[in-house]
Amino acid sequence: MLDPALLRAGRIDRQILVDRPDRKGRQAILKVHLQKITVEPGLNGERIADITTGFTGADLANLVNEAAIVATRRGAVAVSLDDFTAAVERIVAGVERKSSVLRPEERQVVAYHEMGHALAASSLPAMDPVHKVSIVPRAIGSLGYTLQRPTEDHFLISCQMLKDRIVVLMAGRAAEYLAYGQISTGAADDLARATDIARQFITRFGMSPVLGQSVLERQSATYLGERMQGVGEKDYSEQTAREVDIGIRALIEEAYGRAKALLESRRADLDAGARLLLERETLTPEEFPALLPLKPVAVFTQVTETSP
């Protein structure tokens, strides 16, 4: 953070924001870091860039080191694409904690929860394809996770896509309710993320039918002395704040209702998928083609986790 006084005219006139690299930028960064390790013939930065959408330069450097460690642990001389894929998963979802043993009834709840996320994501056409579903606990504190991959970089997100993302997040809790008639604390992280999307939907993107097309909260700034989100007074009245809260609840309840209706229509798939997940613990698209319509798979972006 810089003091705003330093940014007055005549002091620092040029401000450059270094954003996350696009596909071509990732290739250039990877070209530098791949020189430090031995990779399998035919493997290059272009293929790895396809599985690293959203990664920063530091993330890519860490990825190369992590992939080399994965290859070393399996006794390989050269690093393969599978090693990079495993490294991405470790970075995004954390290290597996197979020593953590859940009670049978808890494993069942987690299995239904994660299969709910997976089925919702696969049923909504605008959502990123499901890459992996697992009920193996991870070091980051999750009891299970669902990984999704986009097919390309996204620069614009529609109103419907935001609503569908909330549906996918709420589908874990909806699956628990359909299977057991009650909900658990496993959706805590999902609720936090759904609330964040709903708040931005209303206050940043001007998509609320009630509050209209106005920006109530600025995007949080992380460079050159601009104010950070949450610092300072609110830009709107208490009445507007109440309307924002009502709008957030309405969006989440609407998404929860859609998630329940969707999973009810695919109840047989939900039950079959949960049973298969309990049996194998981790599923890839190749292992459940009858359950999840396959979509082109490219990179990790979203991890939907079950909290303790």
Give the location of each predicted region.
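Short pre-active-site segment immediately N-terminal to the catalytic Zn-binding motif
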Residues: 99-109
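Short hydrophobic/aromatic residue motifs in ordered secondary structure
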Residues: 59, 116-117
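Short regulatory helix/loop adjacent to the ATP-binding pocket of P-loop NTPases
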Residues: 1-11
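Soluble catalytic regions of large protease machineries
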Residues: 107-112, 118-308
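P-loop NTPase motor-domain active sites and their immediate coupling elements
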Residues: 50, 98, 270-273
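Conserved C-terminal "switch" segment of AAA+ ATPases
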Residues: 4-5, 18-85, 90, 94-95, ...
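Structured loop/turn residues at beta-strand edges in well-structured enzyme cores
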Residues: 10, 43, 128
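Non-catalytic interfacial helical region
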Residues: 13-16
